[in-house]
Amino acid sequence: MPLGPEERRFVRLIWLLYSTNPYPPSGEGTARQRRRARRRWRQQQDQIRVLVERLQEQVYAVDRLADEAQHLAIQQLPDPPHSA
């Protein structure tokens, strides 16, 4: 299924968030600083997961609409009368 502009924006955002949010290094800073870094990282990962779920919901909604549209049929209409 081709992605629309909104879905492409979500995919780019998710990719950017994942690529710019590495797990915090261990061994740097005090224990409190490391805990805070891990907490911030988890919060950012939760935001990414919310975006991914939102994107998946939209994709499923579009798929359902496409399935429903396949069941629709155009009513057969008679040909228009020809002028003589």
UniProtKB/Swiss-Prot annotation:
Keyword list, A-Z: Host cytoplasm, Host nucleus, mRNA transport, RNA-binding, Transport
GO terms of molecular function: DNA-binding transcription factor activity; RNA binding
GO (cellular component) term, any one: host cell nucleolus
Keyword Transport included in the entry's annotation: yes
Segments carrying motif Nuclear export signal: 65-77
Main location, first listed in the record: host cell
Segments forming a coiled coil: none
GO biological processes: mRNA transport
InterPro entries: REV_protein
Pfam families for the chain: REV
Origin: domain of life: Viruses
Regions crossing the membrane: none
Entry's localization field: Host nucleus, Host nucleolus; Host cytoplasm
Entry's free-text remark on domains: The RNA-binding motif binds to the RRE, a stem-and-loop structure present in incompletely spliced viral pre-mRNAs. This region also contains the NLS which mediates nuclear localization. These overlapping functions prevent Rev bound to RRE from undesirable return to the nucleus. When Rev binds the RRE, the NLS becomes masked while the NES remains accessible.
Subunit-structure text: Homomultimer; when bound to the RRE. Multimeric assembly is essential for activity.
Protein name in UniProt: Protein Rev
